[in-house]
Amino acid sequence: HEPCGESCVFIPCITTVVGCSCKNKVCYD
């Protein structure tokens, strides 16, 4: 799992549309 370059502390991951998910306040693929 690689970081998607996005955090999800205050807002959800926009990168969920490309298969990323929130883990420990960071978006991972």
UniProtKB/Swiss-Prot annotation:
Q: Does the keyword Disulfide bond apply?
A: yes
Q: Where is this cross-link: Cyclopeptide (His-Asp)?
A: 1-29
Record InterPro entries: Cyclotide, Cyclotide_bracelet_CS, Cyclotide_sf
Q: Which UniProt keywords apply?
A: Disulfide bond, Knottin, Plant defense
> Where on the tree of life does the source sit, at the highest rank?
Eukaryota
Q: Name one GO biological process term.
A: defense response
The question of whether Disulfide bond is a record keyword is answered with yes
**Cystine pairs:** 4-20, 8-22, 13-27
Q: How is it modified after translation?
A: Contains 3 disulfide bonds.
The family note in this entry says: Belongs to the cyclotide family. Bracelet subfamily.
This chain's function reads: Probably participates in a plant defense mechanism.
Q: What is known of its domains?
A: The presence of a 'disulfide through disulfide knot' structurally defines this protein as a knottin.
Protein name (database record): Cyclotide cter-L
The species is: Clitoria ternatea (Butterfly pea)
